[in-house]
Amino acid sequence: MSQIHKHTIPANIADRCLINPQQYEAMYQQSINVPDTFWGEQGKILDWIKPYQKVKNTSFAPGNVSIKWYEDGTLNLAANCLDRHLQENGDRTAIIWEGDDASQSKHISYKELHRDVCRFANTLLELGIKKGDVVAIYMPMVPEAAVAMLACARIGAVHSVIFGGFSPEAVAGRIIDSNSRLVITSDEGVRAGRSIPLKKNVDDALKNPNVTSVEHVVVLKRTGGKIDWQEGRDLWWHDLVEQASDQHQAEEMNAEDPLFILYTSGSTGKPKGVLHTTGGYLVYAALTFKYVFDYHPGDIYWCTADVGWVTGHSYLLYGPLACGATTLMFEGVPNWPTPARMAQVVDKHQVNILYTAPTAIRALMAEGDKAIEGTDRSSLRILGSVGEPINPEAWEWYWKKIGNEKCPVVDTWWQTETGGFMITPLPGATELKAGSATRPFFGVQPALVDNEGNPLEGATEGSLVITDSWPGQARTLFGDHERFEQTYFSTFKNMYFSGDGARRDEDGYYWITGRVDDVLNVSGHRLGTAEIESALVAHPKIAEAAVVGIPHNIKGQAIYAYVTLNHGEEPSPELYAEVRNWVRKEIGPLATPDVLHWTDSLPKTRSGKIMRRILRKIAAGDTSNLGDTSTLADPGVVEKLLEEKQAIAMPS
């Protein structure tokens, strides 16, 4: 692997970077050798009401997984993201909002955002929301989504943000699991010129008889589109905040008080509510933001992620705002109405740091120079990538075309469960290799292990684990600590298992190779195969289903579903469309299968276990080495599947 061309650190970055190679080595060694000293010092990036004495109190031991950081300290997240900046930087822009329609944009100062958050915090209190209550937020990419999240944190309520692309069924499941007392939504969302029926989806979700906890729905008027209204339950955002005071004293929170729940797909069944707490999470989000993006005061920063994903929590809002940065929030999509939209937004707002996903980069790359037509992007200094491993071709295109061959690309590997960046370059400290996430961030101790959990040394490939805790780590799964332990700490004893595989080269750089469990990564979003299979099997005509991922040029992975129909049912183009729409309705558009492969039988072992390894190879057209098929109950099934595959048109 050493033949790969290394990108050296550009002189303009080296001259003013926050961390150089020598500092990285020294700080990294301190962070793993004396974590209490290191994190005790770094914790001062925040303002604490009651300073902490204890720094790290963590255990990955079987039966005793417990993660606590700064546990005797108190603080408030919203005060750290807003109040502490007011005296010196109250007039600095906190959020630049760029609408789906380019003629709509606005700048919101720290002073204005603070006022709006105080008003909404008082509104939540008026509605009877107390510290510890869960509030569901199902909003478009508008500043009010940030206001709602910060207001929850301000009063100590726990927010559960649900991505606006999820279906009513998925919304209901998350409301039920978290026992949300309030839902905050919008009449409609707007994306690529189309309206998204958010309020209607909430109405449908709340018709589920198992939703019993919701008392009110607060509705933001975004489009003025026609919506149904339930008197007494539904309340207009503007009516409520008009009457609210803009004075509010932020609640004193313990560092380990819950901050948010964010649902993420697992390899088994229903989504898991990942729980993050206040102190360690914000220290980690702020520190990683500052160092990985080499943030300097005055930088204009744009993270293209939706607030409904962890990237939107940590790196659209909380990390940047804790550092007093100007963060750009974009309602639209990178290639609408023209392929150059992303580049146009960069020029329009003079963006210095751009953080986006490989799926967007690949979609723009497919447009060639149309993606940069009429723009110069000269304001850019740092580029970043998130959501899935980026292929070297897309990395080089991004570096060359978007960044004019002068901006380091920080390819960040991390997860919902990690709270912030884990393996990532630092612009002034790391030479880059296209496609590699490079080296661990401070305090992160990655290892590669074999199937038995034995650590592998040197240049090698294996399962990626983390051997000790870090402040941003999720503390548990909401209401199910046993599942937390089972999912992340039972595969390899005394280690956090990421679910990803990786290889390490002779320079010690990490290359993420993708999931090793049954989780798909579609356009940078995690989807559990079990979740999609459950949705398919719930269809009245389907007997059995198995879902695998196949490589896709734009999305990274596409969804390939093997479907066995009930006796007497026949495949048809109508049923094909019906089944795809069914999954779309059950989970959301992201989960719609790209390919349905009708088949009478699936390859199973004698104990009835589906051999997914074989299904993955057949779907990907890789039939050179199907491995050992002797354990199959009926080896003839494989030939039949291969024949059926010949007739299937594959997505490009």
Curated annotation (Swiss-Prot):
InterPro entries: Ac_CoA_lig, ACAS_N, AMP-bd_C, AMP-bd_C_sf, AMP-binding_CS, AMP-dep_synth/lig_dom, ANL_N_sf. Mg(2+) binds at residues 537, 539, 542. GO terms for biological process: acetate catabolic process; acetyl-CoA biosynthetic process; acetyl-CoA biosynthetic process from acetate; chemotaxis; peptidyl-lysine acetylation; post-translational protein acetylation. It catalyses: acetate + ATP + CoA = acetyl-CoA + AMP + diphosphate. Pfam families: ACAS_N (PF16177), AMP-binding (PF00501), AMP-binding_C (PF13193). One of its GO terms (cellular component) is cytosol. Keywords: Acetylation, ATP-binding, Ligase, Magnesium, Metal-binding, Nucleotide-binding. Its cofactor is Mg(2+). Induction: By CRP and FNR, in response to rising cAMP levels, falling oxygen partial pressure and changes in carbon flux. May also be induced by acetate. ATP binds at residues 387-389, 411-416, 500, 515, 526. It comes from the Bacteria. Disruption phenotype: Cells lacking this gene grow as well as wild-type cells at high concentrations (>25 mM) of acetate as the sole carbon source, but grow poorly on lower concentrations (<10 mM). CoA binds at residues 191-194, 311, 335, 523, 584. PANTHER family: ACETYL-COENZYME A SYNTHETASE. Catalyzes the conversion of acetate into acetyl-CoA (AcCoA), an essential intermediate at the junction of anabolic and catabolic pathways. Acs undergoes a two-step reaction. In the first half reaction, Acs combines acetate with ATP to form acetyl-adenylate (AcAMP) intermediate. In the second half reaction, it can then transfer the acetyl group from AcAMP to the sulfhydryl group of CoA, forming the product AcCoA. Enables the cell to use acetate during aerobic growth to generate energy via the TCA cycle, and biosynthetic compounds via the glyoxylate shunt. Acetylates CheY, the response regulator involved in flagellar movement and chemotaxis. This is Acetyl-coenzyme A synthetase. It comes from Escherichia coli (strain K12).
